[in-house]
From Swiss-Prot:
GO CC list: nuclear speck; nucleoplasm
Protein name according to UniProt: UAP56-interacting factor
Keyword Metal-binding attributed: no
Principal subcellular localisation of the protein: nucleus
Bias-annotated ranges (Low complexity): 1-25
Family annotation (InterPro entries): FYTTD1 (IPR009782)
Length: 307
């Protein structure tokens, strides 16, 4: 563009800018490019037309919710090691020790030692703990009292005769249950139960309450049927309750004569041969062969045995 065009633009922009822009501003704008001049003019226009009262109200509203040194309600730390999200950075290698008293307990403990250096403090003893730490001394006393009360209460409330009667009744009930169970299985049971008056008299004689009696209140006698001991013969068929077995499955009586198995009958006893140490088996068999040949010759049989 020509110099005249630039001068015309500058004059228009200076008129729009108002009284704030002086001769010094116009001289600076001569050296700037057209784009920079347009941007500056827009900024100045925005500043003029934006009302100042609204800005003040908005700032007051935001300041109500903000604290000094905070951004968007998040507290920010100042100095070294701050985190932009508002949380402290963990120091590497440093852990919180166990057993550290915190909160109200720490304030109470520190209240007694305020203004006293650790070197001048009194050593821990029973008297000092009562003075300085009354909370620590109260707890064991309360625990002891509760333990003593627990031990005394059952001793006072224990009704001795009632408990014994209940125990005897339970034993009797147990005996009756056992008797019914065995009776259903086919066993005759006679439960001899002692009367309650005798049991009460026995309980009164005893002095020590905590020892339980070894003898039970009821005596249980069981009689089991033994068929072998009965003299009168009872047929086995009547005794069986199962279904009758068919005759072809029944085992045959062993009274029948045992059939001799087929094979060559030995004419000598092997055990006796083994006992005779002077004669061998070959000699014995040789003698038998000679006897056979002699018998066959006498009978005149057709067969000839070659020795």
């Amino acid at each position: 563009m020509s110099g005249f065009g630039a001068a015309a633009l500058l004059s228009g922009s200076s008129a729009a800018a108002g009284t704030r822009s002086g001769s010094s501003d116009s001289l600076e704008k001569i050296d700037m490019s057209l784009d920079d001049i347009i941007k500056l003019n827009k900024k100045e226009e925005r500043k003029q037309y934006s009302p100042k009262m609204k800005r003040g109200l908005q700032q007051n509203r935001t300041q109500q919710f903000r604290t000094p040194g905070s951004k968007w309600g998040i507290q920010q730390q100042k100095g070294y090691g701050k985190n932009h999200l508002g949380h402290r950075k963990k120091i590497v290698g440093k852990k919180r020790p166990y057993g550290v008293i915190t909160g109200l307990a720490a304030k109470k403990a520190m209240g007694s030692h305020k203004g006293i250096s650790p070197l001048n403090r009194q050593p821990l003893s029973e008297k000092n703990t009562q003075r300085n730490y009354p909370i620590l001394k109260k707890k064991p006393n309360l625990q002891r009292q509760t333990e003593m009360q627990r031990k005394q209460i059952p001793a006072l409330r224990r009704p001795a005769p009632l408990s014994r009667r209940i125990g005897n009744k339970l034993n009797q009930q147990k005996d009756t249950r056992q008797a019914t169970f065995l009776f259903r299985r086919g066993l005759k049971v006679q439960a001899q139960v002692q009367p309650t008056e005798d049991l009460d008299n026995q309980a009164a004689k005893r002095t020590r309450q905590w020892r339980t009696s070894t003898t039970s209140g009821g005596i249980l006698t069981v009689s089991i049927e033994n068929p072998g001991a009965i003299i009168t013969p009872i047929s086995q068929k009547l005794r069986l309750t199962r279904t009758p077995v068919p005759p072809f499955l029944m085992k045959k009586d062993q009274s029948e004569e045992k059939k001799i198995p087929k094979g060559v009958p030995l004419q000598f006893d092997i055990n006796s041969v083994g006992k005779q140490t002077g004669m061998t088996l070959n000699e014995r068999f040789g003698i038998l062969k000679e006897q056979r040949t002699a018998l066959s010759q006498n009978k005149g049989s057709r067969f000839v045995t070659v020795g």
